[in-house]
Amino acid sequence: MGYYRRRYGERVQKLVLDAGFSCPNRDGTVGWGGCSYCDNAAFHPGYSTPGKALLAQIEEGIEFQRVRYPRVRHYLGYFQAYSNTYGTLERLRRAYEEELSHPEVVGIVIGTRPDCVDEEKLDYLSGLAGGRVLKGWRRTFGGSGIDGGWANERSADSGSGANGGWANERSADSGSGANGWRADDRSANDRSVNSIITNSRSTNDRSTSSRRTSSRSTNSIITNSISTNGISTNSISTNNGSADGGLPEGKTIDAPIVVVEYGIESCYDATLRRINRGHDFECARRAVEMTAERGLDTGAHFILGLPGETREMLLDQCDAISSLPLRSVKFHQLQIVKGTAMEKEYAADPSAFYRPGLDEYLDFVIDILERLRPDLYIERVAGEVPPRFVNDTPWGLVRNFEILRMLDRRMEERGARQGRLFSQ
């Protein structure tokens, strides 16, 4: 059960959206060419394409989700492609408020760079989350879903979900891209997917939960439920949302859920320069602090195995990650995507990259979890792209549920738990 189900009494699914934004390190503002590892097409579901109207993307996304999640009724629009605060405030308002006008959408997740926010934009997002922007906006969880004004108008059957193709084992909550892989990605040659997602069905399915409350957010109560192995994820909840700060059935919210998710990628400035990010870690710290100060749910994304970073460096950066006022963190292993500058760099010097095998990666992830703050929600521990975008699949034919079972067993074998080695 998910973080949102615990808070709102039902599962809430993400819909990946493309609003046509760009990045300042692509257009010459702070650099050219973008991040050296990035090909955004590798992270797009089929329904989310630039130039398509947002409401059309939402409708197609709901239909896309329908088979897998037939009981889901509410969605978060996930602005994922490129930097989704890189534009004028007026442009941002148009995009966000169009998305929030859909009767089955209950909130917004904004993926962006730390150098693409300012006080004005964050104040607007704070007003959006605080109910000061969309007057009369309402959504009802767990009840009939019918309310006045902006409220939900569809029946329970109409707002549901499914993933297709290779994404059959994935949750859109993971938010990392290619959950809309084409049928041709499922060919015999391509079935060696080299990566996985820890999604909203993660360790809670196998855990005995004990609940711990965190109150870092000024506008919400965040309750962690720790499994027997101690992973703090956003996928653990009560059944009806009425306990631990969740909402009872039929409860109405008068303001949308707003989450800001920063691509930080590394805590090392030398790495950020090497991959052409165009900002330093101090910029990321300032952005996270400015966002959290406004009571906004704040998340971050990190890549494990960027060139020049050793295993020891990646473990050492856990202290820096824990020092940030984050609610959630996503990790994924570096994947060498075809046609990127990173592909050329890897071909020239593979020894500069830490690319562990699957067995070593499990222990590595556990070592990271043990060093992180115990109240951080871990939304993802690995990532995946369609096989057609990569040349190698070093982990072979391994699916998500298998990886999750492996990770859970390994943590139990080691007696590991998130935060065990964390020291304030």
Could you tell me what each predicted segment is?
Residues 136-142, 153, 282-342, 359-382:
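Conserved C-terminal portion of the radical SAM core fold
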